[in-house]
A protein has these predicted regions:
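N-terminal chloroplast transit peptides
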Residues: 1-71, 80
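Functionally critical, mid-to-C-terminal surface segments that flank or help form catalytic/ligand
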Residues: 471-531
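N-terminal organelle-targeting presequences
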Residues: 62-154, 175-176, 183-185, 601, ...
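Non-catalytic accessory segments adjacent to catalytic cores
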Residues: 43, 47-48, 54-55, 69-73, ...
């Protein structure tokens, strides 16, 4: 239990039956010491006011299912499911049935819901399948484009997920035989349409563990996936450091958490798809009839309509703001890191330190409404939301790709160095040139790019880096960026790609283990899924972003916003503190009615190339 465990009520009770399937993370004496207020950076005790507050991230749960005005914070209904990562599941081979079925197209979502309910009722009325395990996706095309976020906003079921691919990047190097643009958008030869955004609720099967994500866990997920059913996907996230203790706010996520949604809305370029997925496995004590019954229950709760979202702001103001660490503690931690970087033994080359900021607002923040606001200025970023049953929501707007795999083709990128956008075009150009020519920023960026290149070369053939250095311009910030492509030798190398690329020097440091140990020693909060892999596994392809520019929201007036900065030789602690503010500004802007010192500009995919 770390310092931020006070954000959740210590009387936290399991009200949701789904939570009975999940084991809480252990609490060690070291983590308890952190919760009592020991600041690793200063060696001193934190003042009580920094540990406790009357503000509650999770208020007492209602005793009955009620809907509040405007549909906000209605008590969600939780679907029962099976944990596909039971011991030995990864050794059992593929499930017996992996199938996708398409029903006739519908003119509107309301008609699609009716078709799915009828199809699942027919499954329940028929004879049980003889197959002891399987997964079936049933989908209804809709002849109009719907908004996946607005569909999700109308739903009350948990768990839920959302993932939106970013706009394609130009100038990504191509490999022979590649038909992917490296952003999960596929190519011209795809025989299925790639979703622009996917929203899902319920879990046909979930995958959760408290040990680090392993090859056996990856195989347990892949049992349910198939090239022939490319849109059956497992969406979720992995902890930044699964060997560290999870604090209370992150306990329900385990060390990793993925779901194949029971009901899913796919937003396409010109149309939509509403789909439902049923999964069963007798060996996991989840029979066909269990799965049918639970899916029928979830479908009865699905709203056939969408709910409009105000995407301009959240109509809420900040009442208080506290940072962990404080500015003084941050300066001491950065100074200690610089001592190790410049020391005789050169124990560190780079370390990335992070900050967790607690915002208390005058009203509750709906995670889906926050997601919608982030998406407005996030065309060059991945938007995501993961929320297990009875847990806070992890929401983000990440510009950074960890990797994308399509068949044997891999794409990745290096992203480091940060500057604000300029108030005018001329000012913006000048700031960008300063970033390109900065020796300190070039050192940080080169460390990241060269490390990722070497990691890919260990597993892949044909590693290509182009451009080697360019500007990535986002609405509020700009970064140095490089694009990488490679080719794995077989699809089973996907786990090695994930395991090798995470954590990258962009979010951890170099050497990896030394940087990770420094973070364990000097960060006094739990990163949880922040800076970890966030994305999806599929049969034909998979894609993961790095879970940065993210926040954790529970049912209450408190929100945790995470940001990090790279520390290398030449770093100025105060400049890096300002960089944290800059990276968190997309959240701060939405939590206030206006932000005076941040300039908003339209995102551009690429700027000057070197």
């Amino acid at each position: 239990m770390r310092i931020f465990s006070y954000l959740f009520s210590v009387t936290h009770q399991t009200a949701c039956p789904c939570a009975l399937l999940l084991s809480p993370a252990s609490v060690t004496s070291r983590s308890l010491a952190r919760a009592r207020g020991h600041d690793a950076a200063t060696g001193a005790s934190m003042p009580p006011s920094s540990l406790y507050s009357s503000g509650r991230l999770l208020p007492a749960r209602p005793t009955s299912s009620t809907t509040t005005t405007a549909g906000r914070w209605a008590r969600p209904s939780c679907s029962l499911s099976m944990n596909g990562c039971a011991p030995g599941a990864g050794d059992r081979g593929a499930v017996c049935v992996r199938e996708a079925r398409a029903l006739p197209a519908a003119s509107a979502p309301q008609d699609a819901v009716g078709q799915l309910r009828a199809a699942v009722d027919a499954l329940g009325a028929g004879a049980p399948t003889a197959a002891p395990s399987g997964i079936i996706r049933i989908e209804v095309p809709i002849r109009q484009r719907g908004d996946a976020i607005e569909w999700l906003h109308a739903q009350s079921a948990l768990p839920r997920c959302f993932f939106s691919a970013r706009a394609p990047l130009p100038e990504r190097p191509a490999l022979a035989g590649s038909s992917s643009d490296g952003n999960g958008n596929g190519g011209l030869n795809d025989h299925w349409q790639q979703p622009v955004s996917v929203a899902g609720v319920g879990s046909a099967v979930f995958f959760r563990g408290t040990n680090p994500f392993s090859l056996a866990d990856w195989r347990a997920i892949k049992r349910f996936l198939s090239r022939d059913c490319p849109l059956i996907r497992a969406y979720g996230a992995i902890r930044f450091d699964a060997t560290s203790d999870a604090s209370v706010e992150w306990e329900d996520y385990g060390s990793f958490y993925f779901i194949v949604p029971q009901v899913e809305f796919n937003e396409l370029e010109e149309s939509s798809v509403l789909a439902t997925t049923i999964a069963w496995d007798d060996s996991l004590s989840w029979t066909w009839q269990n799965a049918v019954n639970e899916l029928q229950s979830t479908l009865e709760k699905i709203s056939p309509c969408s709910v409009k979202v105000d995407k301009s702001n959240l109509q809420t103001t900040i009442m208080s703001l506290n940072h962990v660490p404080t500015k003084a503690s941050w300066d001491l931690a950065v100074t200690k890191a610089l001592q190790m970087i410049k020391g005789r033994q050169r124990e560190l080359v780079k370390v990335v330190l992070a900050r967790c900021s607690r915002y208390i607002t005058d009203s509750c923040i709906d995670p889906v409404e926050l997601l919608a606001c982030l998406k407005v200025e996030g065309q060059n970023a991945y938007q995501f939301c993961i929320q297990p049953p009875d847990a806070p929501a992890f929401v983000g707007n990440s510009p950074e790709q960890l990797f994308h795999r399509k068949y044997l083709n891999i794409s990745s990128e290096a992203l480091a160095g940060t500057r604000a956008r300029g108030k005018t075009r001329a000012d913006d150009f000048k700031i960008g040139q300063d970033l390109l020519l900065s020796g300190k920023e070039d050192m940080e960026f080169t460390i990241v790019r060269d490390s990722i290149t070497k990691k890919l070369q260990m597993i892949c053939d044909e590693v290509v880096v182009h451009p080697r250095k360019a500007l990535r311009k986002l609405p509020r910030v700009q970064h140095l960026s490089a694009q990488l492509t490679a080719r794995i030798r077989n699809e089973d190398d996907e786990f090695d790609i994930l395991n090798t690329l995470h954590p990258s020097p962009a979010v951890c440091g170099l050497p990896t283990e030394e940087a990770r140990q420094f973070i364990r020693d000097y960060e006094i909060f739990d990163r949880g899924m922040y800076a970890g892999p966030v994305g999806w596994f599929g049969g034909a392809e998979s894609e993961f972003a790095v879970g940065i520019r993210s926040a954790l929201l529970g049912k209450g007036h408190s929100t945790l916003v995470y940001a990090g900065a790279g520390i290398v030789e030449g770093t100025n602690p105060s400049f890096e503190w300002d960089e944290l503010d800059l990276k968190a500004s997309q959240f701060a802007k939405l939590l206030r009615y206006q932000e005076q010192h941040i300039c908003y500009q339209k995102a551009e995919n690429m700027g000057t190339v070197i």
